[in-house]
């Protein structure tokens, strides 16, 4: 299991976890399973460094929305759950 530092949270949408030199996006999927009221979060390894360095969090929100709408297109970037070991919000 990978682990990292929580660096950004947009409640009800996504969070960003940094592990060494890579960034993971943890995306919240409301009602992921059909006929279920449970929310599920999934982690994705994405090339989002530039967005983070430029503080373009609205663009990251659009990426999270696209992941939810087109989950099948992102399955190859999905990783095992990333454990958050500390919190250093930017």
Language-model region placement:
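Extended, alpha-helix-rich binding/interface surfaces that flank or overlap catalytic cores
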Residues: 1-90
């Amino acid at each position: 299991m990978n682990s990292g530092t929580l660096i950004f949270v947009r409640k009800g949408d996504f969070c960003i976890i940094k592990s060494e030199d890579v960034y993971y996006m943890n995306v919240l999927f409301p009602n992921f399973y059909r006929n279920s009221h449970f929310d599920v979060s999934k982690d994705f390894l994405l090339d989002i460094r530039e967005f983070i360095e430029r503080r373009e969090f609205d663009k990251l929100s659009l990426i999270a929305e696209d992941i939810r709408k087109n989950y099948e297109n992102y399955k190859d970037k999905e990783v095992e759950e990333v454990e958050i070991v500390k919190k250093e919000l930017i």
